[in-house]
Amino acid sequence: MKQTITEKIFSDHVGAQVYAGEIVESKIDMVIGNDITTPISIRQFEKSGAAHLANPDGFAIVMDHYIPTKDIASANQAKISREFAYKHNLKNFFDEKDIGIEHALIPEKGLVVSGDVIIGADSHTCTHGALGAFSTGMGSTDIAYAMITGKNWFKVPKSIKVVLKGRLGEHIYGKDLILKLISMIGVDGALYKALEFCGDIQNIDMDSRFSMCNMAIEAGAKSGIIAADEITKQFFKDKNLRAEPKYFYSDEDAFYERTVEIDMSALEPMVAYPFLPSNGKTITQAVADELKIDQAFIGSCTNGRLSDLRIAAEILKGKKVAKKTRLIITPATQKIYKAAEHEGLIDIFIDAGAVVSNPTCGACLGGYMGILGANERCVSTTNRNFVGRMGDRTSEVYLANSAVVAASAITGKITDPRR
């Protein structure tokens, strides 16, 4: 019987041919925690009486949500992870000296390779499927179990094939593709499914692939996945990889629950209106709605990569942020920040009137470094726009790509960057 890439990855890890719907216990290659979710896992780990991690080199803690800490509570929370990391001499512990948002930092460090099974106590762990791995978010107790045993149980997900055709136009990126898809199938349209992107995938760069897989969860998906190709292998080239990649590809006549086709050449930049990522409208519709904004935000695990900053800088160069608008730019990792500084992008942002912050998840989750007040409106490159997501319950978040956000910051209203 033919298999999808997801079924093949699980078969490899289980040591037997398995198919969608089967319950399996799989070896885990990398377990990821952060400063918010890891302390819960640590408490469960210690409660179990376990003395050692099953796979110390396959466990990473990334301090990214409230780092540097914003208050006493977050400082005490961070202290739990730090003490655990030092006690166990954790190799993959990333704190203020090497700060970054986990789903940008982990691939940057070479800790995910094709063919892996990855779990993380964060819903956007599905990001890493862009590298040809099965990657999904789990609860902190599940993470503790994997810390203790090196394994976890799964119901092998059915797959939805997303066939992409053509090429993306000017100022249209992976963010627009995934917003379009979610608008088509809804926030539960891929519930517990693997969203497998294929077709003319060679026309999509790696950063766009990360954005697409990152937001698979916003359609309810268990994972997003893209089989490795030359672009993937090029991404791996300058990395000190944790392991040798194993490349798997879906059989031509493998079973898919559904197939969705998207003509990339017909896409416009997309904007997801409050209060769901599925409320996608074209930029033409958004411009017609004359949506004034109070804040523009570029960053997050979805769109805080170097390509996003380059796109924003190209638009902002020589311009000024609108008088009544705030622009916050948050590079996803220190390496990205340093590269942006080297290329002169940080100067462009500051000269335009933007605030450039350290890498953090803070604004995206309404934690700090960009919280919205009552009735404020923000256009953002983040991944969620639920009620109160970035601040006050009466505030509004509109999701868009980096070009749309940069252009909107200049005009003070949601703007088409192509105009």
Swiss-Prot record:
Binding residues for [4Fe-4S] cluster: 301, 361, 364
Pathway per the UniProt entry: Amino-acid biosynthesis; L-leucine biosynthesis; L-leucine from 3-methyl-2-oxobutanoate: step 2/4
GO BP of this protein: L-leucine biosynthetic process
Cofactor comment text: Binds 1 [4Fe-4S] cluster per subunit.
Protein EC: 4.2.1.33
Primary gene name: leuC
Keyword Lyase: yes
Catalytic reaction annotation: (2R,3S)-3-isopropylmalate = (2S)-2-isopropylmalate
Cited InterPro entries: Acnase/IPM_dHydase_lsu_aba_1/3, Acoase/IPM_deHydtase_lsu_aba, Aconitase_4Fe-4S_BS, Aconitase_4Fe-4S_dom, HAcnase/IPMdehydase_lsu_prok, Homoacnase/IPMdehydase_lsu, IPM_dehydratase_rel_enz, IPMI_cat
Family: Belongs to the aconitase/IPM isomerase family. LeuC type 2 subfamily.
Listed GO MF terms: 3-isopropylmalate dehydratase activity; 4 iron, 4 sulfur cluster binding; metal ion binding
Superkingdom field: Bacteria
UniProt entry keywords in alphabetical sequence: 4Fe-4S, Amino-acid biosynthesis, Branched-chain amino acid biosynthesis, Iron, Iron-sulfur, Leucine biosynthesis, Lyase, Metal-binding
The protein's role, per its UniProt record: Catalyzes the isomerization between 2-isopropylmalate and 3-isopropylmalate, via the formation of 2-isopropylmaleate.
Classification via Pfam families: Aconitase
Cross-referenced CDD domains: IPMI (cd01583)
SUPFAM superfamilies: Aconitase iron-sulfur domain
Cofactor or coenzyme needed: [4Fe-4S] cluster
Record text on subunit structure and interactions: Heterodimer of LeuC and LeuD.
Name recorded for this polypeptide: 3-isopropylmalate dehydratase large subunit
